[in-house]
Swiss-Prot record:
InterPro entries: NADH_UbQ_OxRdtase_chlpt_su5_C (IPR002128), NADHpl_OxRdtase_5_subgr (IPR018393), ND/Mrp_TM (IPR001750), NU5C-like (IPR003945), Proton_antipo_N (IPR001516). NDH shuttles electrons from NAD(P)H:plastoquinone, via FMN and iron-sulfur (Fe-S) centers, to quinones in the photosynthetic chain and possibly in a chloroplast respiratory chain. The immediate electron acceptor for the enzyme in this species is believed to be plastoquinone. Couples the redox reaction to proton translocation, and thus conserves the redox energy in a proton gradient. It is a multi-pass membrane protein. It comes from Solanum lycopersicum. This is NAD(P)H-quinone oxidoreductase subunit 5, chloroplastic. NDH is composed of at least 16 different subunits, 5 of which are encoded in the nucleus. The keyword Transmembrane applies. Its main location: plastid.
Length: 737
């Protein structure tokens, strides 16, 4: 076993040859490299599979022996300063390694078909392999310096992939937004690392924890400074994991290819922040108020992400806000000290969210056969509907991921989310109420996405729904709008422009809607030889990863079922995390009262089903029959209550669709303020500083011309004037000084 750990340092470097060879091939043999470009997908999958097998083997050994291995070698030694590098293999490392490799392999297989016709195919796989290397290096790091180096590399790969289609201004802007937002957190992380080095004199995790605990025990620290350093460290995790208030980059990151959205949201960039807090939890838990701050940020993000997902029309943005909310649950669990629950939810959410994103990619891929290549149209749920008939396999797997995220047993996320919800009651009743209410919102917005996408009829085939004015099909839904105002930062709804859900207006459906052969939309800038009337199921190379992730979603929750009775122990996760849990909670007891568990499970599942029921009631395919509208309208009549209800709905819509006005606030005050300062600085530089410099030159020129005119071109006159000026200056100096 010791020999196996000795070779674990190679884990981050196994996928590295792919980007290096692709780069060398494009420089030395560009034609051959591009011609045989599909072989790089096989090599990427092969190398990452080797890492996966190695990680699984290490994990099995850790489960059986509860061991932790660390190897360190000194790189720089100078008097009292030494910089060490090494690797740490513990349960957290092995869990993250398996997550990165399993999800990464599925995404790579999926991407081979998804990106097959993209000119940046080679560039994409080079970035992806380097992304895997960076993330594996991050999770195996044994000190804060290595963490920071690989932290920045993970960010670099994320920016490259978010802005992969950099010729599109929207993608370029999203890349810049992610970069600038994460700069704030990364700067805080760097300051926090330097602060704790100044306090303890070490970057190594083991030494750092031990020295810091001794200083705390002996009361030799300035707690205000220590708390500030801890907050700065936490700021890095806030930005990376899209926690409030540095969450604004996450929905815009959907401008990248869909496979990278799956990887970022499941096992890499956003998981890095959760990993950092989990790694530093022995440090945070002994600092006053920092754990409470982590839980507060987590619960705010839980609720904010759920409310912002309610009105999204873009399927990927809806899933992005869902990720934000679920990451908030993990951060809340870490803030409460529920280490096991947080990592359990990290595992289950990773597979469920990867399944949902790859499923959305399959949906987008199929919609492009109708609307052409246009992300604004192919990702718009208002143009979808009825896809269950055309993409049945994608529909089944997407439903599995949706039910899992809703917390429906026995799917994966039910077990992990239920633990967090139960622990929240012991920590704070207020936090518990918010967390449980958000569980219902999660079920609502996830089933909203599912119903708008798969149920009803294909909305892209309908052009008019009553009246002379053409309105989008999705405007009939609860969160609909008549259209998008261009060049407007904020969008609002009022009684004149909104189309209410509970109205007596009938919306006739085109009789020939399902027999149309002409596409609903065409793109002038994109050439396509033929466009299909209906979407079709994706190829097997895209369906295979979705199917495998569906199996993970079904069964991965079993590793954390807290069943330990009569000598039968099914709780693999607790055995796996035993060294870390014993470090944090030496006298912890993982036994569970099953009566209490079943009681809480019934409540949480009931809340989830209530959210599903509301979503089904509001978003079921009512357009196939007007009887549903008549049934609803029989309960609601026009009047003051109806007007008030509509205003409330419109207010909720405006809040959600405009991202809680946080982006607008940042744009107006931060971006506008910085631009105003830049313009003022430019004015001072050009008008004042340059004016002074140019003014001296102009005055010198005028004086010179004057002397030239008075002197008449004679050298004797110039000498006389020069001596006169010198005499005047000497006289003034003598009189004054």
């Amino acid at each position: 076993m010791e020999q196996t750990y000795e070779y674990a340092w190679i884990i981050p470097f196994i996928p590295l040859p792919v980007p290096m060879l692709i780069g060398a091939g494009l420089i030395l043999f560009p034609t051959a490299t591009k011609r045989f470009r599909r072989m790089w997908a096989f090599q990427s999958v092969l190398l990452l599979s080797i890492v996966m097998i190695f990680s699984i083997y290490l994990s099995i050994q850790q489960i059986n022996s509860s061991s932790v291995y660390q190897y360190v070698w000194s790189w720089i030694i100078n008097n009292d300063f030494s910089l060490d590098f090494g690797y740490l293999i513990d349960p957290l490392t092995s869990i993250m390694s398996i997550l990165i490799t399993t999800v990464g392999i599925m995404v790579l297989i999926y991407s081979d078909n998804y990106m097959a016709h993209d000119q940046g195919y080679l560039r994409f796989f080079a970035y992806m392999s380097f992304f895997s290397t960076s993330m594996l290096g991050l999770v195996t790091s044994s000190n804060l310096i290595q963490i920071y180096i690989f932290w920045e590399l993970v960010g670099l790969c994320s920016y490259l992939l978010i802005g992969f289609w950099f010729t599109r201004p929207v993608a370029a802007n999203a890349c810049q937004k992610a970069f600038v937002t994460n700069r704030v957190g990364d700067f805080g992380l760097l300051l926090g690392i330097l602060g704790f080095y100044w306090i303890t004199g070490s970057f190594e995790f083991r030494d750092l924890f031990e020295i810091f605990n001794n200083l705390i025990y002996n009361n030799e620290l300035n707690f205000l400074f220590v708390t500030l350093c801890a907050v700065l460290l936490f700021a890095g995790a806030v930005a990376k994991s899209a926690q409030f208030p540095l969450h604004v980059w996450l929905p815009d990151a959907m401008e990248g290819p869909t496979p990278i959205s799956a990887l970022i949201h499941a096992a890499t960039m956003v998981a890095a922040g959760i990993f950092l807090v989990a790694r530093l939890l022995p440090l945070f838990r002994v600092i006053p108020y920092i754990m409470y701050l982590i839980s507060v940020i987590g619960i705010i993000t839980v609720l904010l992400g759920a409310t912002l997902a309610l009105a999204q029309k873009d399927i990927k943005r809806g899933l992005a806000y869902s990720t934000m909310s679920q990451l908030g649950y993990m951060m809340l669990a870490l803030g409460m000290g529920s280490y096991r629950s947080a990592l359990f939810h990290l595992i289950t959410h990773a597979y469920s969210k990867a399944l949902l994103f790859l499923g959305s990619g399959s949906i987008i891929h199929s919609m492009e056969t109708i609307v052409g290549y246009s992300p604004a149209k192919s990702q718009n749920m208002g143009l979808m509907g009825g896809l269950r008939k055309h993409v049945p396999i994608t529909k089944i797997t997407f439903l599995l991921g949706t039910l899992s995220l809703c917390g429906i047993p026995p799917l994966a996320c039910f077990w992990s989310k239920d633990e967090i919800l139960n622990d929240s009651w012991l920590y704070s009743p207020i936090f518990a109420i918010i967390a449980w209410a958000t569980a219902g919102l999660t079920a609502f917005y996830m089933f909203r996405i599912y119903l708008l996408t798969f149920e009803g009829h294909l909305n892209a085939h309908f052009q008019n729904y009553g009246g002379k004015q053409k309105i989008p099909f999705y405007s009939i839904s609860l969160w609909g709008k008549n259209g998008v105002k261009k060049n407007s930062c904020l969008l609002t709804m009022n009684n004149n422009e909104s189309t209410y859900f509970l109205s007596k207006t009938k919306y006739p459906i085109a009789k020939n809607g399902r027999k149309m052969t002409r596409p609903f939309m065409t793109i002038a800038h994109f050439k396509h030889k033929a466009v299909s009337s209906y979407p079709y199921e994706s190829d097997n190379t895209m369906l295979f990863p979705i199917f495998v992730l569906g199996l993970f979603t079904l069964f991965v929750g079993a590793i954390g079922i807290p069943f330990n009775q009569e000598g039968v122990n099914l709780d693999i996760l607790s055995k796996w995390l035993a060294p870390s849990i014993n470090l944090l909670h030496p006298k912890s007891n993982n036994s569970l009262d099953w009566n209490e568990f079943l009681k809480d499970a019934v409540v949480s599942v009931s809340i989830a089903y209530f959210g599903i029921f509301i979503a089904s009631f509001l978003y079921k395919p009512i357009y196939s029959s007007l009887k549903n509208l008549e049934f609803i309208n029989s309960f609601v009549k026009k009047g003051p209550k109806r007007i008030l209800w509509d205003k409330i709905l419109n207010g909720i819509y405006d809040w959600s669709y405009n991202r809680a006005y946080i982006d607008a606030f940042y744009t107006r005050f931060f971006v506008g303020g910085i631009r105003g300062l830049a313009e003022f600085t430019h004015f001072v530089d050009r008008r004042v500083i340059d004016g002074m410099t140019n003014g001296v030159g102009v005055i010198s020129f005028i004086v010179g011309e004057g002397i030239k005119y008075i002197g008449g071109g004679r050298i004797s006159s110039y000498l006389f004037l020069y001596l006169a000026y010198v005499s005047v200056f000497l006289l003034v100096y003598y009189l004054l000084f």
